[in-house]
Amino acid sequence: MHSESPIIRRQSTRIYVGDVPIGDGAPIAVQSMTNTLTTDVAATVAQIRALEKVGADIVRVSVPTMDAAEAFKLIKQQVNIPLVADIHFDYRIALKVAEYGVDCLRINPGNIGNEERIRSVVECARDYNIPIRIGINGGSLEKEIQLKYGEPTPDALVESAMRHVDILDRLNFDQFKVSVKASDVFLAVESYRRLAKQIKQPLHLGITEAGGARAGSVKSAVGLGMLLAEGIGDTLRISLAADPVEEIKVGFDILKSLRIRSRGINFIACPTCSRQEFDVIGTVNELEQRLEDITTPMDVSIIGCVVNGPGEAEVSHLGVAGSSRKSAFYEDGIRQKERFDNDNVIDQLETKIRAKAAMLDVNNRINVQEVEK
């Protein structure tokens, strides 16, 4: 029930990764990358399907060898979600996976080779109508740029990006997006800011090698949050040393917190104190697990007492405000006659949330049909 995001997004061109639009006002796409051995087709397919289940729009797959390229062919045949092939060092692998139906090619200018090799990749991408991501990384800049700047700097990352943007421009190829990732938040943010002023192409956001699940999520939220709040970014990946499924969840949580794109339930919950009338922490943790299948955007407030409970509930789709013996229940900001037993809040609220989600889905379908008329 909270208002729309006040963020004005940067204008960019539009490309498509498979059937997923990127840029020009399209929803910010959330993606992850498999961490299985690509040659283990069954494991890689299973992980891709797990990512798709939690809402991934795009999945990137590392293709380090020709054997991996042959495995990629089999993987592509077994999944529906768009796949990006991550190519380093050997440009010929890009040519091979293009034959196998890849939806996007990620190339790293720091190691893909000379302009003639890039030309070969671009011409192949053009023939197969495949977009490219120019993926700059602070840890793998070209040797001459490393020598020039001594260390990764915003100027270094942007210069590397612009070199290859210029190559694609000369080849009259405009179906590409760009990333300038770094593990340092300020370095990445400033690099993206500068690049956003110089090109119109979509930008893929990420803080590379951000760390483990907790620290990496925080670092990514800070860095990407700064950029997204300024309207910069058309697609993103959260890089965690963790289960890739967590990357998708964190990505959507960041977008949800900025009201840019919502998927599933936005739980508003207090940190608890001695005033709580029911187990708020246990309730939230249990409901988050039980309701992972709900994709309907919805605000649900779970507050343990009457200090902030009513106020939060009044701006939520559903809300519970703790009170002695029985807690108050709100729907669409209005307090209901029904009250929840404090020892059974989880089951009662789950039932209400599922019913509300179904109702909102019906209303959304009706609204879409009205617009289409």
Curated annotation (Swiss-Prot):
- SUPFAM superfamilies, alphabetically? Dihydropteroate synthetase-like, Nitrite and sulphite reductase 4Fe-4S domain-like
Q: Please list the residues that bind [4Fe-4S] cluster.
A: C270, C273, C305, E312
Q: Give the UniProt record's GO annotations in the biological process aspect.
A: isopentenyl diphosphate biosynthetic process, methylerythritol 4-phosphate pathway; terpenoid biosynthetic process
Domain of life, per lineage: Bacteria
Q: Which UniProt keywords apply?
A: 4Fe-4S, Iron, Iron-sulfur, Isoprene biosynthesis, Metal-binding, Oxidoreductase
**Cofactor mode of binding and number, as noted:** Binds 1 [4Fe-4S] cluster.
This protein's pathway reads: Isoprenoid biosynthesis; isopentenyl diphosphate biosynthesis via DXP pathway; isopentenyl diphosphate from 1-deoxy-D-xylulose 5-phosphate: step 5/6
What molecular function does GO assign, one term?
Answer: iron ion binding
Q: Show the catalytic activity.
A: (2E)-4-hydroxy-3-methylbut-2-enyl diphosphate + oxidized [flavodoxin] + H2O + 2 H(+) = 2-C-methyl-D-erythritol 2,4-cyclic diphosphate + reduced [flavodoxin]
Cofactor(s) needed, names only, are: [4Fe-4S] cluster
Organism lineage = Bacteria, Pseudomonadati, Pseudomonadota, Gammaproteobacteria, Vibrionales
Question: Looking at the keywords, is Iron present?
Answer: yes
Broadest EC class?
oxidoreductase
What's the protein name? 4-hydroxy-3-methylbut-2-en-1-yl diphosphate synthase (flavodoxin)
Species source reads Photobacterium profundum (strain SS9)
The similarity comment for this entry is: Belongs to the IspG family.
Q: What is its EC number?
A: 1.17.7.3
What role does this protein play? Converts 2C-methyl-D-erythritol 2,4-cyclodiphosphate (ME-2,4cPP) into 1-hydroxy-2-methyl-2-(E)-butenyl 4-diphosphate.
Classification via InterPro entries: Dihydropteroate_synth-like_sf, IspG_bac, IspG_bac-typ, NO2/SO3_Rdtase_4Fe4S_sf
Task: Cite a single Pfam family from the UniProt record.
Answer: GcpE
